[in-house]
From Swiss-Prot:
This is UPF0367 protein Npun_R4552. It comes from the Bacteria. Belongs to the UPF0367 family.
Length: 90
């Protein structure tokens, strides 16, 4: 399972959705990057594959970072790294 975390401006905690395959996670990651780069205030809607009832919608201009984390059962802490790092493209 892959988790895609979105860091939102002026929000302390990231918003997360899950994908079952690396290809699907990469597709969502690229979608978010394109939305961030566009600079438009369009709404990005995502559904979670891990929790099928979970849906999110966020204004693309408010997303400040995105990361993909692979979750496996062998890593302590659920596979999530201890922080979130966002790189802004200039």
């Amino acid at each position: 399972m892959f988790t895609i975390d979105l860091s939102i401006r002026n929000t302390a905690f990231p918003i997360s959705v899950q994908r079952k395959s690396a290809e699907d996670a990469e597709a969502v990651y690229q979608l978010i990057l394109a939305a961030i780069r566009s600079g438009n205030p369009d709404i990005v809607e995502l559904k979670c594959e891990g929790k099928t009832e979970k849906k999110i919608a966020v204004r693309a201009s408010e997303i400040s970072g995105v990361q993909i984390v692979q979750k496996d059962g062998t890593t302590p802490g659920g596979g999530r790294p201890p922080g979130f790092f966002a790189v802004a493209a200039e």
